[in-house]
C-alpha cells in the first residue's frame, strides 16, 4: 500500500487530485485510482513501478494502445489513467481526462509526421509490408492472419459484389506480388472467377512484355534486371527481387502494377456476377426514391466505364428511369440539382401520405370515367307518364292538376286502379274481353281430328260431362261427319 501510494507526492499529488474524470464533472482523481492502476498493471503482467516516471508511463501507453480497439472497458480506463498520470509527471497542467487524451493524440501525430518526413528525405519507402529494421535494411513482413481472414470473409459474404474491389485495395496497400498471390490463393471457392482473373493477368503481362522489350546484351554490373510480366505477377521473381525493385532508385512499383492488373480482372468478375445493366434499373411505382438511388449506384459501381460516362449516366438515367411522380418533381428542379436536393424533394413519394393522395386521384379519375360512360349511353330513357293528367315528365304523386276521380285506368268511379277489372292490351295492341272466347293472339279455331276415337278398355270409369260443358263443346267443336264414306264396309 505504501509503495503504491508513493507514486505521487507533494505538488504532483495536489495537481492529480484537481483533474476531473469527465469535462465539467464533479468527480476528480484520487489516490485510490493510482492504487487501482498499479493492481491492473500487475494483472496485465506489467511493472507497476513504471507509473513513477513519465518515461515509464510512456512505455505503458505504447504497450496498451494497440489493444484499445479490441480491449475491455477496464483496459481503456487503465489507458486513460496512465495518460493523465503521464501529463502530471510532465507538469502539463491538464484539467480533465479528455484534454489529456487529445494532447496525447496530437503529440503522436506530430511524431509520426516527423518520422515520415525523415524517411522521405532519405528516399526510404515506409509502405507496409516492406519496413526498415533497426540496421536500416528493408525487410518484408508477411500479411497478418487477421488481414487474410478479413479478405476471405468478404469473399464468402459478398461473393464478387462491387464493394469487394475497394476492400481488396485497402487490404493490399503496399503489398508485394507475393503477398497479392497469397491473398488470391486463400480464396477457396469461385474457381471459375479465379480462372477469369488468371486470364486477365496473363493478358496484361503479355501486353507489358510487348511495351517493355528486353534490352540486348547483359545488364550493367550492380544494376538489377528489368522486370518482365511474369516477374510482376510473382511467378518468376523472388521476394527479395520484388523488394529491391520496389525500394530501388528509381523504384519499379511491381506491387502496384500487379495490383492494378488484379483490380482490372476483378472488375470483369464483378460485371459477370452482376448481370443487371444500369439501363434496367427503374424505380417501381411504390418504391421510395432512396431505395431506387441505392440500387442505381450499386449497379453503377459494377459498370466498366470512365468517370465521365458514369457522371452522364447519373445525370440522365437517374431522372429518366424514375417513376412518373418522382420524374415530375425532378424535372421541376432543373438540370443543375444535386443528389441531396433530389432525395429531399422526393422524400415523401412512396410513403403513406403520397399513397393516399395517389389513391384519391385514381378514384377520382375512375369516377369521372364512369360518369362519362353514363352520359354517352345512347339507350332510350324510360318515359314517365302521369296517371292523373296524362302528361309526361312527372308522376301522379307530384301532379299539380286537380285530382281525377275514379279509376285512373278505365275512368269509371267506384273503384281504384288496383281493383280495376278492365283487361290490358296484349302485345298486339288488341284488347279482348274475358268472356268472348280465346285471346286474340291465339288461334280462334282448332283443326278437326281425323283419327277414330280412343277405345275404352274398362280400366277406369268414364267421366260424365256436365250439360254446360257439352253445350260449350258443341259450340267449339261441331259434330264430326260419318267416316263410313272413308273406310267403306271396314268393320
Curated annotation (Swiss-Prot):
GO terms for cellular component: host cell nucleus; host cell plasma membrane; host multivesicular body; membrane; viral nucleocapsid; virion membrane. A motif (LYPX(n)L motif) lies at residues 476-486. Coiled coil: none annotated. The modification Asymmetric dimethylarginine is found at residues 381, 403. A zinc finger (CCHC-type) spans 384-401, 405-422. Residues 73-77 are annotated as: Interaction with membrane phosphatidylinositol 4,5-bisphosphate. One of its GO terms (molecular function) is RNA binding. Residues 458-475 have a biased composition (Basic and acidic residues). PROSITE patterns: ZF_CCHC. Residues 273-359 are annotated as: Dimerization/Multimerization of capsid protein p24. HIV-1 lineages are divided in three main groups, M (for Major), O (for Outlier), and N (for New, or Non-M, Non-O). The vast majority of strains found worldwide belong to the group M. Group O seems to be endemic to and largely confined to Cameroon and neighboring countries in West Central Africa, where these viruses represent a small minority of HIV-1 strains. The group N is represented by a limited number of isolates from Cameroonian persons. The group M is further subdivided in 9 clades or subtypes (A to D, F to H, J and K). This is Gag polyprotein. It comes from Human immunodeficiency virus type 1 group M subtype F1 (isolate VI850) (HIV-1).
